[in-house]
Structures are given as structure tokens and as C-alpha cells.
């Protein structure tokens, strides 16, 4: 019982600290250092295009494909897979190179539902495409769910995030992302401290 109370107390303190940080004037300058990771765009067996955004992410995934970094793209996410596929096709990616997972509603489900598909195809390395604020949790989740696969991650084009609208959207999403990181750590055991890439 004492251990349970200790865990609850720690979680409450973590959430309070997170909310304090979100209201701090330091947050707009600090979140990129907390959430963003250094992009890595080496060759991989596949590209994973995470859903949740229909413009910058598919454009970046198509660019990586055209650059020859991977021979195929896996789209995951139930809300916008059709729009993302359409954008990939319009960007010159052949339909035969696209595989769709259309049921995932969360980042954790992205990884869990893709796992059997990647295993079936013998994927041993994958390059994840997502937004800057989502990088840390996305990579942590995929490493947690598929420790035998070598994952690298890259962000969408930074130009959008430098616009006034982009900065506002990024800050809003980053606020929510910090809460999700704490939740994923507490509930699913997904630690945001990442393993080094190998």
C-alpha cells in the first residue's frame, strides 16, 4: 500500500511540475530542446509516415523516398491515411511502394499495429517521419515496442515552424506532448530517455 501511495505521489508531482513548466515564460524557448531530437536521415529498410498531419509529413516522406533512402513507405493512422497516400502519389511515390495501416489512433497503436507488418517484411531498420514536437515520444515508443529494429527519426521541413502560425501551433502541440510523455512513462513504461542509435 505504501509503495502505491508513493507512486501516486510521484505521478502527481510530475504532472504538477509539467503544468508549471507549461505556464512558465521559459516554455516557448525551452520546448525545442526538450522534445526535438537531432534528425537522422540514413538509409533504412523502410520509411514510417506517422498520421496526425496531412501536409508536411507526407511531403517529407516522399522526399526521402525520392532520395533513395528507403524502397517503401508504411503509412499508419486511421484519421488521414487516405489523404497521406494521395499526397505521396502526387509527389511521385508509386502505389506499389506504399503500405497502409489504417486502424491506429495513438502513437502507441502506430507501433503495435505496425509491428506484425514490419516483422512479416523482415524490416530491421526504419526511418520515422513526424513533426518536431513529436520526435522524442515517437522514437521512444517505437524503440520500446520493437527493440530489435534500428529506428532513426527525422522531422518535417522546419520552414513551416518558423512562420507565426507554425510557431503558435507548435507551442500548443508541445504543451500537450509534454503531458503525453509523462502519461506514457507512467502508464505504459515508455521512458523518454532514448537508447543510442546503433
Residue ranges and their predicted role:
Residues 15, 26, 179-180:
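Alpha-helical structural elements
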Residues 1-4:
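Positively charged n-region of N-terminal signal peptides that target proteins for export
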Residues 6-22:
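Hydrophobic membrane-insertion alpha-helices, especially the h-region
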Residues 166-197:
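A transmembrane-helix-recognition feature enriched in membrane-embedded lipid enzymes
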Residues 18-168:
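A structural signal for short, hydrophobic/glycine-enriched beta-strand patches
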Residues 9-13, 64, 144, 187:
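Enrichment for repetitive, rod-forming helical segments
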Amino acid at each position: 500500500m505504501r509503495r502505491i501511495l508513493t507512486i501516486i505521489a510521484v505521478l502527481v508531482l510530475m504532472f504538477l511540475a509539467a503544468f508549471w513548466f507549461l505556464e512558465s515564460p521559459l516554455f516557448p524557448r525551452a520546448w525545442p530542446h526538450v522534445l526535438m531530437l537531432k534528425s537522422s536521415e540514413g538509409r533504412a529498410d523502410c520509411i514510417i509516415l506517422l498520421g496526425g498531419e496531412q501536409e508536411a509529413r507526407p511531403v517529407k516522406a516522399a522526399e526521402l523516398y525520392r532520395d533513395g533512402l528507403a524502397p517503401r513507405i508504411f503509412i499508419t493512422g486511421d484519421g488521414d491515411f487516405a489523404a497521406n497516400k494521395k499526397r505521396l502519389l502526387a509527389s511521385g511515390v508509386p502505389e506499389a511502394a506504399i503500405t497502409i495501416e489504417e486502424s491506429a489512433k495513438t502513437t502507441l497503436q502506430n507501433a503495435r499495429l505496425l509491428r506484425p507488418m514490419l516483422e512479416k517484411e523482415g524490416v530491421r531498420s526504419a526511418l520515422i517521419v513526424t513533426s518536431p514536437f513529436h520526435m522524442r515520444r515517437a522514437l521512444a515508443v517505437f524503440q520500446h515496442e520493437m527493440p530489435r529494429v534500428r529506428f532513426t527519426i527525422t522531422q518535417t521541413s522546419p520552414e513551416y515552424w518558423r512562420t507565426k502560425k507554425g510557431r503558435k501551433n507548435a507551442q500548443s502541440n508541445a504543451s500537450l506532448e509534454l503531458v503525453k510523455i509523462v502519461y506514457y512513462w507512467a502508464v505504459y513504461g515508455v521512458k523518454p530517455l532514448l537508447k543510442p542509435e546503433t
